[in-house]
């Protein structure tokens, strides 16, 4: 779509997104915020949350083993033939406008999307190796539960940009 046609560019289409997040059930305020953006996105980019059980940590248990367990569960839960984006502090940063461009590109490709949030120690090396892209939300350290909400909001913002919706005001 060109700039003139962009208003109709992001109608409901075959592309869906999944957020695979390692961790326990989110606190009510995170779940409520995520659900709000999930609802807003539903007609542009349906977004499904898949919670992945965290690895066992604690006395006598190596964190690397827990991360490896989480990685195996994430990889097992991934649908086939999806565009995989791992959220990682060492990944590439995007502006909201750049994210909108990526979303437009993905929709043109027709593949579903999978966004991955790792556990406390991040992603297992096997997960990062399988990812098509690695993103960082910025140099700040964010609680993993908050990342769910921030990602959902940024996906909504990108979709709103593509649809010429007034939500995004730079």
Regions found by a protein language model. Name each.
Residues 12-41:
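N-terminal beta1-alpha1 ligand-phosphate binding loop
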Residues 125-169:
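Structured adenosyl-cofactor binding patch, chiefly the S-adenosyl-L-methionine
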Residues 101-138:
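A mid-sequence interfacial segment
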Residues 20-22, 50, 116:
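Short hydrophobic segments within beta-strands
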Residues 31, 35-38, 68-72, 125:
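Short, surface-exposed alpha-helical segments at coil->helix boundaries
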